[in-house]
Swiss-Prot record:
NCBIfam families: cyt_kin_arch. It comes from Pyrobaculum calidifontis (strain DSM 21063 / JCM 11548 / VA1). Its EC number is 2.7.4.25. The gene is cmk. The lineage of its organism: Archaea, Thermoproteota, Thermoprotei, Thermoproteales, Thermoproteaceae. GO terms for biological process: pyrimidine nucleotide metabolic process. CDD domains: CMPK. GO terms for molecular function: ATP binding; CMP kinase activity; dCMP kinase activity. GO terms for cellular component: cytoplasm. It catalyses: CMP + ATP = CDP + ADP; dCMP + ATP = dCDP + ADP. This is Cytidylate kinase. Belongs to the cytidylate kinase family. Type 2 subfamily. ATP binds at G8, Q9, P10, G11, S12, G13, K14, T15, T16. InterPro entries: Cyt_kin_arch, Cytidylate_kinase_dom, P-loop_NTPase. Its main location: cytoplasm.
Length: 184
């Protein structure tokens, strides 16, 4: 029962990498970020508003995280999300953390969301501040402590193809060693 958890900073490439890893490994992908965005839409809020709302309403994070935990317990899944690896670590075979410089991430988010660089930078900084505060308050998790990760990868100067290749090489080596069979 393979479980891969990919976490990382906003704009680091975690969703794109998780989607491609899931495709190659022929596993479903569950995105905590997508679940969070769906809930924001359901509540009629934009992402930043919903982050602020979630700060006051801890049940939001608990709903998202309980879905990730259920999927991890069931196995055979790639999970993606900012906090996901910390939540599912006991069930995960491989945990990867993606990071990049704030400027690179702001450029990526600006391009993805069709907003200015400055707006993307402000959103990233605010989301990170809110996430750090919320996760510490709800779970006593310091998201700056990356010691639970098997691989920490700086994607600042890597193409998406290089990031996926490095991630898959690491995942396949880890799974092949753990399960003594060829997964990839």
């Amino acid at each position: 029962m393979v479980v891969v958890a990919i976490s990382g900073q906003p704009g680091s490439g975690k969703t794109t990498v998780a989607r491609e890893v899931a495709r190659v490994l022929k596993l479903p992908m569950v995105s905590s970020g997508s679940i969070f965005r769906e809930l924001a839409a359901k509540y009629g809020m934009d992402l930043l508003e919903f982050h602020k709302y979630a700060e006051q309403n801890t049940e939001i994070d608990k709903i998202v995280d309980s879905i990730a935990l259920e999927k991890a317990k069931a196995g055979n899944v790639v999970l993606e999300g900012h906090l996901t690896a910390w939540i599912v670590r006991p069930y995960a075979d491989v945990c990867i953390y993606l990071k990049a410089s704030k400027e690179v991430r702001a450029r990526r988010v600006a391009m993805r969301d069709g907003v200015s660089f400055d707006a993307a930078l402000r959103e990233i900084e605010e989301r990170e501040r809110l996430n750090k505060k919320r996760y510490l308050a709800i779970y006593e998790i310091d998201i700056d402590n990356l010691s639970i990760f098997d691989l920490v990868l700086d994607t600042s100067y890597l193409s998406i193809n290089d990031t996926v290749r490095i991630s898959l090489d690491f995942i396949c080596t880890s799974l092949n060693s753990k399960y003594m069979k060829n997964f990839c």
